[in-house]
Amino acid sequence: ATGTLQNKDDVLNSTKKRRLKKAKKSSKPIFIVTPDEAYDNELEKSSDYKTWSFKADNVRDFAWASSRKFIWDAAGFKQDSIENPLVMAMSFYPNEGEPLWSKYSTEAVMHTMAVYSKYSFDYPYPTAQSVNGPVGGMEYPMITFNGPRTELEDDGSRTYSRSEKEFLIGVVIHEIGHIYFPMIVNSDERQWTWMDEGLNTFLQYLAEQEWDINFRSDRGEPRWITDYM
């Protein structure tokens, strides 16, 4: 959700709290809810109710997601910022997204913050999240929804192509980038499109090429502007 969880003692068991504490000090994603645990949760419906409390400062919108199918991984992203030196990068996704999501989603979240902060400004929020949702991609303060999943094969395994891998990495970069523009700068994306999609697409291209020089970016190459000239 948008914000920082305020009542973890009420909603997380000791195992999840221990894993989350470990993730804060890890530069690589750590499972807070494992794939096996998510599968077990999917089979067992709960009749209990829990209230999750979040607090957010300096936001203009709010979003949240909830599913017993969610795998949850997290890592601590360190940045050279006195005001906000540590950001919790997190991803939430079902087993239908594996093995793609656990390999690349949270890594792409952290990569985006590293590149965007280098070329623009430090990420000011305490969390940055990527959620596998029913959309191609959509952003809100601190949380994004991204669509790609893997293909189910006849033998029950799940696979993904290079295109699907690059789609996930690209959409995560793009939507996390939108937390910078327009969410943080608070511009009107309908009136000032160049301050939203324009700046974001430019930085997305830089981030994709820094991820992999052979990344097949579908936007951002300067020579493509000739189509509009």
Regions found by a protein language model. Give the residues of each.
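Hydrophobic helix-coil surface modules that form long, contiguous segments used
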Residues: 1-173, 202
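Zinc-dependent metallopeptidase catalytic helix centered on the HExxH motif
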Residues: 110, 114, 160-228
